[in-house]
Amino acid sequence: MLFYINKILSNNKVQAVILWIIGLAIVIVLMSYNIDDPSFNSVTTEYPSNLIGIVGAYLSDFLYQFFGLTSFIIPLACFIWGRNCWYGRYRSAFIRIFVVLLALISSSTLLSKIKLELIPASAGGAIGIIVSNFCERFINQLYLLLIFPTFIILVVLLEIKFTAISNFMIKLSKFLTYWILLFFNYVLPRLSLIGLFPIKNNDKLNITSFYQKPASGKVKFTEEASLIPANPIKCFIKPVCTKISQNQIASLPPISLLCDPKNNHVKGASSSELKQKAEELLTVLNDFGVKGQIININQGPVVTQYEFEPAAGTKTSRVVGLSDDIARSLSALSTRIAVIPGKNVLGIELPNKQREFFCLKELIETNEYQDKSILLPLVLGKDLAGKPLIADLAKMPHLLVAGTTGSGKSVGINAMIVSLLYRYTPEECRFIMIDPKMLELSAYDGIPHLLTPVVTEPSKAVIALKWAVKEMENRYRMMSNIGVKNIAGYNAKILEAVKENRVIERPIQTGFDPETGKPIYETVTMNMVKLPYIVVIVDEMADLMLVSGKDIEMLIQRLAQMARAAGIHIIMATQRPSVDVITGVIKANFPSRISFKVTSKIDSRTILGEQGSEQLLGMGDMLFMGNTSKISRVHGPFVNEAEIAKITEYLKETSMPVYISAVTEQPEENYSSIDIGDGSIDEVLYKKAVQIVRNERKSSISYIQRSLRIGYNKAANLVEKMEKDGIVSSPNHTGKREILLPEM
């Protein structure tokens, strides 16, 4: 019986209700207080008028005598503690008691000089009179009125999140500074016209120390042309590499937009339970003729890994093939068996009875995420030991993600995007988001980090990838001009030049002198602009491969091979990891891959090169293969749509997006290797196809496809165009076409 009572009282919801009932009872006791009721100071035979009875009469008299009106702080504290218990926000009992005592003593001291008929002593009670008389011996009464309100403010600060206060003060200071500067910038030039406030030509108002962007970059203000023929005060900050307008000062989103981690940490299995499960596992292995011993147990938030050392002569493939039989024998959802790199053991992973869920905020607040050596942090989740796993996209340098519907793939991609949004401003990192499904990435449409609105048409997706290739080539030319090898060196050199107030110039040969034959050089000034990282996110690769497979594969290959040093990285996802979507060329250029739960062993081998993904549990459970080809199991964090909506709304309010129209606009030139997917025909390519048909006397789609090295859809469009122009006939009953052009 006591066990069940203890179990009920340990529930946070039950504790909250009990605290609320106690607080309400104290309020009723204090509100129904009557000085004529029986108490410690008076004796009467009449029944007490207090609503709680004789207990309420004595309790109210005690509280009013000692604490006065400040007794209402006690039920207020009960209500606040009950709310915290309800939401699982536990704090130290010492801190809670200290806060209440500090509030009672400070408030009682402030009210000690007020006399009331209801309370014989004072409005602050006996405690207030004692503390006030003691302090007046050493401190002036005026200072006393300043010290104890400070204690009350300290109480309020202890009960409120410091992050909320700091964010409010930052926003308030930004707002006031901005409008004060606008006021002086508008009023002072007009006062100088009438001689009230003369301004010299070289007067400048330096606000560097008053207003700076709360991120790693600096902001340069651009001034509008004034209509007043006077010398206005110039409002400036030392120019750096990126420029944004004065009403679009971008900042990182506050951490308070993310949901707080709930206190739902599941109590793990005890050591005795783990040993018992290990013995059961050994028994099952012995039943199948596998001998060995378990040397270590690693309990994680979702699964528990048993390190099994097989006997000498036991093949690994034999143990791995028993995964389904072990899961059936132990009544487990699934079992994954894999070799642990660097150890002479096999890791047998069994799911826990209760799964631990954790949110993204818990991982963003870790030291691993704050590590500045990680240039492009991607929050992946927690490993088998429960430690945060933060990957660096700059070192990957590209990521391939696969998983079926409901496996947590979309939530994982959202966590990666949000982790980048919390690290970089729009001047430091930009995105190209391609979402043919028009569902997953549409929530980010309109944020200032985008180079173009979310691309949903496959034809524009090819153009966007083509633009990324051109941007990569342009960046390589810029880096070679100043003699650096990567984007980090380029930005460092630009920042160094800006700090020294100099420009970077480079002589370029433009020709030769016709008289002397010596080379002619011209000095070219480099554009002093910092290059941001560009992350290309493709949510569904299968749809793009269906429309223009060859062209997409070629562009992805070029970016994956060369774009790392230029600061362009790709995150590509698909829910159909088949060989026609994830081709050998793509796999060779994406060493870093993530596989969520898939349907079959074949899909697991396609994405990772080995089986195991089909044994995952779903809901964020994944296998991560870094660029070292080492596979580790990771459990992803949860980020809901409400959090994403808050973050995107904040970013939209702080800054407007600056789109580059060329990202999705078809260039005027004709490129024979571009299939825009809408049935249009390139005239140059069409003439080549007609020439091939005339010379070779072959008109099949596959032959034209091989000859021109284009996609099947484009070759079919060319043949249909020839049929309309009367070059070839329509296909007969066997599918062959007759060539109507005469031989050359």
From Swiss-Prot:
It comes from the Bacteria. Residues 200-744 are cytoplasmic. SUPFAM superfamilies: P-loop containing nucleoside triphosphate hydrolases, Winged helix' DNA-binding domain. One of its GO terms (biological process) is cell division. Its main location: membrane. ATP binds at G406, S407, G408, K409, S410, V411. PROSITE patterns: FTSK. It is found in: Cell inner membrane. GO terms for molecular function: ATP binding; ATP hydrolysis activity; DNA binding. It is a multi-pass membrane protein. GO terms for cellular component: plasma membrane. Gene3D superfamilies: 3.30.980.40, P-loop containing nucleotide triphosphate hydrolases (3.40.50.300), Winged helix-like DNA-binding domain superfamily/Winged helix DNA-binding domain (1.10.10.10). Pfam families: FtsK_4TM, FtsK_alpha, FtsK_gamma, FtsK_SpoIIIE. Keywords: ATP-binding, Cell cycle, Cell division, Cell inner membrane, Cell membrane, Chromosome partition, DNA-binding, Membrane, Nucleotide-binding, Transmembrane, Transmembrane helix. The chain crosses the membrane at residues 15-35, 62-82, 92-112, 114-134, 138-158, 179-199. Residues 386-605 form the FtsK domain. The keyword Transmembrane applies. Homohexamer. Forms a ring that surrounds DNA. Consists of an N-terminal domain, which is sufficient for the localization to the septal ring and is required for cell division, followed by a linker domain, and a C-terminal domain, which forms the translocation motor involved in chromosome segregation. The C-terminal domain can be further subdivided into alpha, beta and gamma subdomains. The alpha and beta subdomains multimerise to produce a hexameric ring, contain the nucleotide binding motif and form the DNA pump. Essential cell division protein that coordinates cell division and chromosome segregation. The N-terminus is involved in assembly of the cell-division machinery. The C-terminus functions as a DNA motor that moves dsDNA in an ATP-dependent manner towards the dif recombination site, which is located within the replication terminus region. Translocation stops specifically at Xer-dif sites, where FtsK interacts with the Xer recombinase, allowing activation of chromosome unlinking by recombination. FtsK orienting polar sequences (KOPS) guide the direction of DNA translocation. PANTHER family: DNA TRANSLOCASE FTSK, SPORULATION PROTEIN RELATED. Belongs to the FtsK/SpoIIIE/SftA family. This is DNA translocase FtsK. The lineage of its organism: Bacteria, Pseudomonadati, Pseudomonadota, Alphaproteobacteria, Rickettsiales.
